[in-house]
């Protein structure tokens, strides 16, 4: 979600446990390069004014944390209603079930996307795009069953790049990967 927010000049917020509507608004205000005000209504008005002037996509990561706080979810709906800015919710596998409790909100979703495990071709594309060290197809095929979550993959790429630089590796072959993993 953070990567998408950066790519599309959006607003990225990571929801936190016990996050209130006030806290959420303060975070959005900060993302809009404003100083949060004392009154919640002032913060809401700043968000609306700034987003009407310069519309941006809002990405809310870990939306699961907000599912038990009706007012916070309604605040997001109000922001969308007033600004018409798209809001992307990113959550765990059962978040759509939790969101169904908010019928008037759930009906507004244009699309619900469930991310499945990466295929070998997907993994190769990720490694080709993010790693400075090339990987053979065979090495990617070996990695595939063991590392299939994006965060895991990013951590693995980082660790393998450090190892490659420390050990003069210019390309990861199956034999090398097999010895490391």
Show which residues each predicted segment covers.
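P-loop NTPase Walker A phosphate-binding motif
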Residues: 1-10
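C-terminal alpha-helical "lid" subdomain
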Residues: 2, 104, 116, 121, ...
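A short helix-turn-beta junction within AAA+ P-loop NTPase domains corresponding to the substrate/partner-engaging
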Residues: 9-10, 101-117
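Conserved NTP-binding/hydrolysis module of P-loop NTPases
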Residues: 9-11, 21-38
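Conserved nucleotide-binding/hydrolysis micro-motifs of P-loop NTPases
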Residues: 17-20, 65, 93-97, 118-123
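Central P-loop NTPase core of STAND/AAA+ ATPases
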Residues: 30-54, 66
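Conserved P-loop NTPase "ATPase switch" module shared by AAA+ and STAND
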Residues: 48-72, 86, 91
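Sensor-1/coupling segment of RecA-like P-loop NTPase cores
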Residues: 79-103
């Amino acid at each position: 979600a953070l990567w998408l927010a950066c790519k599309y000049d959006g607003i990225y917020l990571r929801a936190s446990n016990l996050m209130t509507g006030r806290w959420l608004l303060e975070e959005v205000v900060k993302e809009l390069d404003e100083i949060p005000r004392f009154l919640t209504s002032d913060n809401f008005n700043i968000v609306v004014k700034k987003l009407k002037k310069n519309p941006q996509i809002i990405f809310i990561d870990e939306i699961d944390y907000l599912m038990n706080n009706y007012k916070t979810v309604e605040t997001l709906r109000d922001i969308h209603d007033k600004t018409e800015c798209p809001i992307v919710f990113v959550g765990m596998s059962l978040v759509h079930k939790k969101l169904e409790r908010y019928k008037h909100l759930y009906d507004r979703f244009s699309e619900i996307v469930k991310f499945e495990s990466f295929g070998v071709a997907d993994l190769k594309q990720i490694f080709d795009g993010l790693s400075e060290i090339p990987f053979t197809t065979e090495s990617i095929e070996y990695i595939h069953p063991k590392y299939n979550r994006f965060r895991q993959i990013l951590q693995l790429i980082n660790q393998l790049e450090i190892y490659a630089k420390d050990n003069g590796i210019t390309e990861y072959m199956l034999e090398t990967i097999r010895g490391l993993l």
